[in-house]
C-alpha cells in the first residue's frame, strides 16, 4: 500500500485502547443504519456487508459483487470497491464506541474484481492520536487468504453525535440509536 503522510500515524500515536462495552471477540456487528449503502440491510442495491470482530481489534466482512455494482461490463466499479473499504474501516472504529467520520481514504486497486465474486475484507487500526484514527484495510478475492484485489489506508476523525444531528436527520438517528445522546 502506498500511503501518504496524511494516513500514516505520527510517532506519538498509540494503539487503540480497550473500551468498556466494545464488542467482544467473535461478535457479529450490526448495521449502524438500515439504509446505509455499505452495511444496511434495508438498502435495495447496497453492499450488505456482514461484519464481525474475530479478536476485538480487527473487523472482517464479506460482500458479493452484484450486477448493480459493476462499472465496466461484469467488473466491480472502483467506487464500489472504495465504498467497501470505507465501510469495513468505519466498522472497525465502531470497536472504539465513539462516532468517527472519514477524513481521508486512499485506495490501491491491484486486481479486477468480477461480478459474482465474494470479496473478503479485513480492517485494523494502526494508531490513535487525539481525535485521529489511522487505519488500513484489504479486500481479497474468493477467500480470506485469496489474492489481494484492493487495499486502503484511511484517516478517520472522531466527532460528537451533534455532528450527525446538524448535518443529517436527527429523527432517523434517534430511531436507529435511542441510546446515543445528542448534545447531552
Predicted region positions:
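A short, contiguous structural element within a folded domain that forms the immediate neighborhood
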Residues: 68-78, 83-95
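HotDog/MaoC-like acyl-thioester-processing domains
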Residues: 1-28, 113-115, 126-184
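Short capping/connector residues at structural and topological boundaries
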Residues: 41-44, 80, 114, 154
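Short beta-strand micro-motifs enriched in acidic
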Residues: 52-54, 124-128
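Residue-level recognition of well-ordered beta-strand positions that form the cores
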Residues: 62-64, 106-108, 122-124, 138-140, ...
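Catalytic strand-loop segment that frames the active site of acyl-thioester-processing enzymes
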Residues: 31-76
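Hydrophobic beta-strand-centered segment that forms part of the acyl-chain substrate-binding groove
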Residues: 3-6, 14, 87-120, 147
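A generic structural signal for short beta-strands and their flanking turns/coil linkers
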Residues: 32-33, 45-47, 57-61, 101-105, ...
Amino acid at each position: 500500500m502506498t500511503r501518504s503522510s496524511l494516513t500514516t500515524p505520527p510517532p506519538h500515536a498509540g494503539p487503540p485502547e480497550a473500551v468498556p462495552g466494545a464488542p467482544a471477540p467473535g461478535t457479529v456487528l450490526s448495521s449502524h443504519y438500515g439504509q446505509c449503502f455499505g452495511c444496511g440491510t434495508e438498502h435495495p442495491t447496497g453492499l450488505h456487508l456482514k461484519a464481525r470482530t474475530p479478536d476485538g481489534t480487527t473487523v472482517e466482512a464479506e460482500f458479493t459483487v452484484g450486477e448493480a455494482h459493476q462499472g465496466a461490463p461484469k467488473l466491480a466499479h472502483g467506487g464500489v470497491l472504495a465504498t467497501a473499504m470505507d465501510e469495513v474501516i468505519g466498522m472497525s472504529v465502531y470497536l472504539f464506541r465513539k462516532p468517527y467520520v472519514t477524513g481521508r481514504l486512499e485506495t490501491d486497486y491491484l486486481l479486477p474484481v468480477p461480478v459474482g465474486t465474494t470479496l473478503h475484507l479485513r480492517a485494523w487500526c494502526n494508531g490513535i492520536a487525539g481525535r485521529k484514527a489511522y487505519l488500513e484495510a484489504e479486500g481479497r478475492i474468493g477467500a480470506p487468504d485469496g489474492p489481494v484485489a484492493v487495499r486502503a489506508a484511511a484517516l478517520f476523525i472522531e466527532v460528537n453525535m451533534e455532528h450527525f444531528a446538524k448535518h443529517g436527520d436527527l429523527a432517523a438517528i434517534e430511531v436507529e440509536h435511542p441510546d446515543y445522546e445528542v448534545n447531552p
